[in-house]
């Protein structure tokens, strides 16, 4: 079967031919319809320091997808041939304390699809049936293919009660924009998103986010004053991993504010910890999606009217995968979809 693989320890992704994976007793065989390119895939393409430490070569990459069940392991129940599915990309052990306690997303033995085991940039994917999620009929293939990053956005945004709250989102990448859209959809009062990339801020506006701030040109505190905010933000969603953005968030949080962090800053990032202590801030780290509460919420948000379609900006056939990676690497894209049909 055709697959996109990391074949060499250098920059690039290559189309290759690999065997169709074998289905285990507890697995599903999924025929891939559409995949989306993640920022993680770009890191792997670029062969940066993280990738060099993490990715075994060769490796079929990719973890954002939708497909059709075409094979079922003999121990699997609850799925039928023809079911349309996406799936949780974190394969958990099932026997650690967190797994047994129902906190599966915190499994210390997690393996990543397309990172530690073969991924979805292929004609077929084998996945434990436990990890598969059936896609409702009224959700399109395009939207289903981005459930993985949408789940990151939902998990981050819904970490705290947002109704009537003022929310700051730092980082207008696709996940940050989707998190801002979720906050607005569920009843936040003012939702402000910051970045230095004007293309991404315009994309946020297309997604219905009114208050977009280019911090290279505008002062965030001036925007807050124009909105009549006198006490700071109640909730911060840090999606950028940029130290200046996190420091600005700490400066503008209200006392008792709550921050969810999905962006990954440099390990040597320094902050003024007195702002955390004396403001009584609560900071929560976010990794992946809650299994599977986040997945049900994703479907419900779309079914209740949340429109994510503007976040998908580019579509290519799988044979044009290089154009897709070029678009993602340019910084001038939202989500990029690759069709395998």
From Swiss-Prot:
Signal peptide: none
Required co-factors: Zn(2+)
Cofactor note: Binds 2 Zn(2+) ions per subunit.
Keywords carried by this UniProt record: Cytoplasm, Metal-binding, NAD, Oxidoreductase, Zinc
Swiss-Prot/TrEMBL site (Important for catalytic activity for the proton relay mechanism but does not participate directly in the coordination of zinc atom) positions: 148
GO MF annotations, alphabetized: L-threonine 3-dehydrogenase activity; zinc ion binding
GO biological process: L-threonine catabolic process to glycine
Known catalytic reactions: L-threonine + NAD(+) = (2S)-2-amino-3-oxobutanoate + NADH + H(+)
Predominant location category: cytoplasm
One Pfam match: ADH_N
Subcellular location: Cytoplasm
Keyword Transmembrane helix: no
Associated pathway: Amino-acid degradation; L-threonine degradation via oxydo-reductase pathway; glycine from L-threonine: step 1/2
Catalytic residues as annotated in Swiss-Prot or TrEMBL: 40, 43
Origin superkingdom: Bacteria
Recorded GO CC terms: cytoplasm
Listed InterPro entries: ADH-like_C, ADH-like_N, ADH_Zn_CS, GroES-like_sf, L-Threonine_3-DHase, NAD(P)-bd_dom_sf, PKS_ER, Zn_alcohol_dh
Binding annotation for Zn(2+) 2: 93, 96, 99, 107
Family of this protein: Belongs to the zinc-containing alcohol dehydrogenase family.
HAMAP family: Thr_dehydrog (MF_00627)
Functional note: Catalyzes the NAD(+)-dependent oxidation of L-threonine to 2-amino-3-ketobutyrate.
PANTHER family: L-THREONINE 3-DEHYDROGENASE
Subunit organization: Homotetramer.
The name this protein goes by in its record: L-threonine 3-dehydrogenase
Gene (UniProt): tdh
């Amino acid at each position: 079967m055709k697959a996109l693989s990391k074949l060499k320890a250098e920059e690039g992704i290559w189309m290759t031919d690999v065997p169709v994976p074998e289905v285990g007793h507890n697995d599903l065989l999924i025929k891939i319809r559409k995949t989306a390119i993640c920022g993680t895939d770009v890191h792997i393409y670029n062969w940066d320091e993280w990738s060099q430490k993490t990715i075994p070569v060769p490796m079929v990459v990719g973890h954002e997808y939708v497909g059709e069940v075409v094979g079922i392991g003999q121990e699997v129940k609850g799925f039928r041939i023809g079911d349309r599915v996406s799936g949780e990309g974190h394969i958990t052990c099932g026997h650690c304390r967190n797994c047994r306690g129902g906190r599966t997303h915190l499994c210390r033995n997690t393996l990543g699809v397309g990172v530690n085991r073969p991924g979805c940039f292929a004609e077929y994917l084998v996945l434990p049936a436990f990890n598969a999620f059936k896609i409702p009929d009224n959700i399109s293939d395009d939207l289903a293919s981005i459930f993985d990053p949408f789940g990151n956005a939902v998990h981050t945004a819904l970490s705290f009660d947002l109704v009537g709250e003022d929310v700051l989102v730092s980082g207008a990448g696709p996940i940050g924009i989707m998190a801002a859209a979720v906050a607005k959809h569920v009843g936040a009062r003012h939702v402000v998103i910051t970045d230095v990339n004007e293309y991404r801020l315009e994309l946020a506006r297309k997604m219905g986010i009114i208050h977009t701030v280019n911090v290279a040109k505008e002062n965030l505190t001036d925007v807050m004053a124009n909105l009549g905010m006198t006490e700071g933000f109640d909730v911060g969603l840090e999606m950028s991993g940029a130290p200046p953005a996190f420091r600005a968030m700490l400066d503008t949080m209200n006392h008792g504010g709550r921050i969810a962090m999905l962006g990954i800053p440099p390990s040597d990032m320094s902050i003024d910890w007195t702002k955390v202590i004396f403001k009584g801030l609560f900071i929560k780290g976010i990794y992946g999606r809650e299994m599977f509460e986040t997945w049900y919420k994703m479907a419900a948000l779309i079914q209740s009217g949340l429109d994510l379609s503007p976040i998908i900006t580019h579509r290519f056939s799988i044979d044009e995968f290089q154009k897709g990676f070029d678009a993602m690497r340019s910084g001038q894209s939202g989500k990029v979809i690759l069709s395998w049909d």
